[in-house]
């Protein structure tokens, strides 16, 4: 039965969402926590301590930031730079990137960072996207797998100790992320909340897609990540996540909004992609 949150009207078709006895979603409950219960000054102090510990390591890059050029990743980069971190930025290049997305990504790079723009073999990407759409009605599974897998692969290969993600969607918008407390992104988190329908790259190996084809979508083992000393955090754990505020800060630093919304009501979200992101995953 279709239900809607009585506060925000988010439907129960969103994966992992939970409603309380008053039919209020856990995303709204989280909003109350952010406003009343969480000590954000203490969280920011914890981030400063983390930054200090990272700077004491001998890596050339202090952190890796997955970016699209959108308002949120622009804010992530600005925050990292304001703390004196030396980031490497990595982008999974959507096959549908538009001119506005290109401009905003270049604007992010011009903030003063090194950047890798990673394109996956288009023949593989096309096959994989079609398969996920036919099986689940979701063409975005390859996108989410690629964004997360390429990031951890790159951090391990470049010996970068810290990955800085944006918001924890399972905390901000609904999901029972009780064990991780919104702090870190792990393989366990990705499989449950990463919009992959609980699948991993090896689940999609068949006569059309080989293990070699799907290598960019492969998440290294927990042991490989642990041995490399790579930690992946959500910046939204340390700073109060507010899309309107990140939009304001990004706009003050060159980010351009769209002429009209691509999806929903906002012209500053999901505007870098011409068609793929507009096919919503729930």
Identify what each model region corresponds to.
Residues 1-63, 79-282:
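Nucleotide-activated chemistry modules centered on ATP-dependent adenylation/adenylyltransferase
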Residues 63-72:
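Short, glycine-rich nucleotide/cofactor-binding loops
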Residues 75-77:
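Long, structured ligand/cofactor-binding scaffold of large enzymes
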């Amino acid at each position: 039965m279709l239900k809607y949150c009585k506060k925000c009207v988010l439907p129960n078709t969103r994966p992992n969402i939970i409603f309380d006895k008053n039919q209020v979603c856990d995303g709204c409950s989280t909003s109350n926590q952010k406003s009343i219960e969480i000590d954000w000054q203490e969280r920011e102090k914890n981030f400063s301590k983390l930054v200090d510990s990272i700077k004491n390591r001998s890596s050339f890059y202090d952190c890796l930031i997955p970016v699209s050029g959108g308002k949120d990743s622009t804010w992530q980069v600005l925050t990292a730079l304001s703390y004196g971190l030396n980031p490497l930025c990595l982008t999974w290049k959507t096959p549908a990137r538009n001119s506005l997305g290109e401009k905003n990504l270049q604007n992010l790079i011009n903030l003063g960072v090194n950047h890798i723009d990673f394109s996956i073999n288009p023949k593989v990407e096309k096959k994989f996207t079609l398969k996920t759409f036919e099986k689940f009605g979701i063409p975005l599974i390859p996108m989410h797998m690629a964004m997360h897998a390429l990031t951890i692969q790159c951090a391990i290969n470049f010996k970068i100790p810290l990955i800085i993600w944006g918001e924890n969607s399972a905390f901000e918008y609904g999901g029972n992320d009780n064990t991780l407390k919104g702090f870190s992104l792990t393989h366990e988190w990705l499989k449950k909340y990463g919009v992959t329908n609980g699948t991993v790259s090896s689940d999609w190996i068949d006569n059309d897609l080989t293990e070699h084809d799907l290598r960019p979508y492969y998440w290294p083992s927990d042991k490989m990540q642990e041995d490399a000393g790579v930690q992946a955090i959500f910046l939204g754990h340390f700073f109060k996540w507010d899309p309107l505020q990140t939009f304001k800060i990004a706009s003050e630093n060159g980010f351009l909004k769209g002429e009209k919304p691509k999806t929903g009501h906002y012209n500053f979200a999901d505007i870098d992609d011409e068609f793929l992101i507009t096919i919503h995953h729930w």
